[in-house]
């Protein structure tokens, strides 16, 4: 596997409470770790993958540093308690960008995701900038060519930019073009969008692509009226679901460690209300958490918030 590296055992360290009781375990004690990329040979049905890349953020004129996200998030996860579902996780290593070669990294991630999915594993990818979503989403599309895949993005931004080259602002336009090329529907829902952070051109493109959008104000005003029906529609209409969480959807007070912190945002407690029914639906095939930038974290606050999201997803995933 090109651009792939196994995760060092040193990243999975934590407090050992096993002297108290046999089940006093933490994630670092229950996660399996692949020494080579062979998902069909590994136990568990949740493949944890890193995408150490922020070349897309650089191209999008953002604050770089998210390439260090996978390592920081693994460290944050390692010491969390291991409960139901967590022993299904296997660390399948990290795809790392080589210099500015984003397109090659995209292809490597795409192939790694498709291989994991075909081996019967759902994928939980730790980014990396939001360019992660193109490689991840394309891998899911490749693994399920005859099925309807719904894409749900929790994000302050639509990420449908027109640009000469791929970036962290283009992944869903790229996925739309990929769906066009494969002659399949592009089914995209974006929840938590800030109207103040997206130009009219992006809203026009969303309308042209028939994107279902729920703005941040609507999420905060009435969850049951604006959000729940969209979740229920996605679960009912599509065969598989791909959930991508841009951590800049969170308020800056909860998530300072991103390229573009949100002035308003959707709080973590509400994000968990969105995530739970998707995890329990039996249709959620893939999840990623992107844009975490440890360079801008404050006392590990952002890492803990992101890790709690990932922890909860693995716990609820059915």
UniProtKB/Swiss-Prot annotation:
Keywords: Histidine metabolism, Hydrolase, Manganese, Metal-binding
Catalysed reactions listed for this entry: N-formimidoyl-L-glutamate + H2O = formamide + L-glutamate
Molecular-function GO term, any one: formimidoylglutamase activity
Protein name (database record): Formimidoylglutamase
Residue ranges crossing the lipid bilayer per the database entry: none
Function according to Swiss-Prot or TrEMBL: Catalyzes the conversion of N-formimidoyl-L-glutamate to L-glutamate and formamide.
Pathway it works in: Amino-acid degradation; L-histidine degradation into L-glutamate; L-glutamate from N-formimidoyl-L-glutamate (hydrolase route): step 1/1
Family statement: Belongs to the arginase family.
Cofactor: Mn(2+)
Residues reported in the UniProt entry to bind Mn(2+) 2: 155, 157, 246, 248
Cofactor: how and how many bound: Binds 2 manganese ions per subunit.
Gene designation: hutG
Organism: Klebsiella pneumoniae (strain 342)
């Amino acid at each position: 596997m090109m651009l792939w590296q196994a995760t060092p055992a040193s990243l999975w360290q934590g407090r050992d409470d096993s002297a108290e009781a046999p089940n006093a375990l933490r994630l670092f004690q229950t996660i399996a770790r692949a020494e080579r990329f062979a998902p069909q040979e590994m136990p568990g049905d949740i493949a944890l993958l890193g995408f150490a890349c922020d070349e897309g953020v650089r191209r999008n004129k953002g604050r770089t540093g998210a390439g260090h996200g996978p390592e920081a998030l693994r460290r944050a996860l390692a010491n969390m308690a291991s409960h139901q579902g967590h022993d299904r996780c296997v660390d399948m290593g990290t795809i790392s960008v080589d210099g500015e070669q984003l397109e090659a990294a995209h292809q490597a991630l795409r192939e790694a995701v498709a291989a994991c999915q075909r081996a019967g594993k759902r994928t939980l990818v730790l980014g990396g900038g939001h360019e992660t979503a193109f490689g991840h989403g394309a891998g899911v599309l490749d693994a399920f060519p005859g099925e309807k895949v719904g894409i749900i993005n929790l994000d302050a931004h639509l990420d449908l930019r027109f640009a000469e080259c791929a970036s962290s602002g283009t992944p869903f336009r790229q996925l739309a073009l990929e769906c066009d090329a494969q002659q399949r529907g592009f089914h995209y829902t974006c929840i938590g969008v800030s109207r103040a952070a997206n130009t009219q051109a992006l809203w026009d493109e969303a309308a042209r692509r028939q994107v279902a959008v729920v703005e941040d104000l609507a999420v905060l005003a009435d969850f049951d009226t604006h959000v729940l029906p969209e979740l229920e529609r996605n679960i009912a209409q599509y065969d598989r679901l791909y959930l991508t969480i841009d951590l800049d959807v969170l308020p800056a007070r909860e998530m300072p460690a991103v390229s573009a912190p949100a002035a308003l945002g959707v709080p973590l407690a509400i994000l968990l209300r969105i995530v739970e029914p998707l995890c329990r639906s039996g249709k959620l095939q893939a999840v990623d958490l992107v844009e975490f930038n440890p360079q801008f974290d404050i006392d590990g606050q952002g890492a803990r918030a992101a890790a709690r999201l990932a922890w909860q997803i693995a716990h609820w995933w059915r």
